[in-house]
Swiss-Prot record:
This is Small ribosomal subunit protein uS3. Part of the 30S ribosomal subunit. Forms a tight complex with proteins S10 and S14. Residues 211-262 are annotated as: Disordered. The gene is rpsC. Transmembrane segments: none annotated. One of its GO terms (biological process) is translation.
Amino acid sequence: MGQKIHPTGFRLAVSRNWASRWYASNTQFAGMLKEDIEVREFLKKKLKNASVGRVVIERPAKNARITIYSSRPGVVIGKKGEDIELLKAELQRRMGVPVHVNIEEIRKPEVDAQLIADSITQQLERRIMFRRAMKRAMQNAMRLGAQGIKIMSSGRLNGIEIARTEWYREGRVPLHTLRADIDYGFSEAETTYGIIGVKVWVYKGDHLGRNDAPVVEEPQEERRKRPGRPEGRRREGEGRPAGQRRGAGAGARRGTDAKTGE
């Protein structure tokens, strides 16, 4: 199941959170969900060159708070904040409520799965060999601290007539382990031969759950004593000089007594 299911949806209740965080009645839910999808598509087209990893939408009390995670926040903000003000006005017009826009910087874009997928698709659209693009992305991710990465490309690779799928993996990517921090990204390249889909899984380590706290080892002197062995007493034979057999001292004394007759 872990190989097929969406890694983020699989871990939502364990180590991941929703990208849309709000509550709505049954009559309003579908409309608000459609609005979120349209806002994300608009931001994806508008900020195509800003390296946007993900967009989080919150709706507190007739307002909207949109957090944009980008590796190039200067492109989103623009000169003296002009671009972000225009973006905020357009979002308010689309959503019909006051909108607050926050920009969060992605410190390591080389290990962000969505940014890796977008980078590979941009290279494919520029006619770069897909194997070279995939292997270069894997090397950069492993160099910057990823514990494992898997990249899959599907479609008419290199313009061949029959579509196929190729994937490469480096390190370990435990998709069945719920506590594993798996970042997932998907992107599509629109080439002259058709669409090529790129999927990326990045393994960044394990999340510690409530019962998985690290165990501190007890000092040697405070360890519990073995059962049936009182403190301060040693077994017979412990502490003898090396090479001396058990009972050798008593036998030697008896032999001396027999010779002297004492």
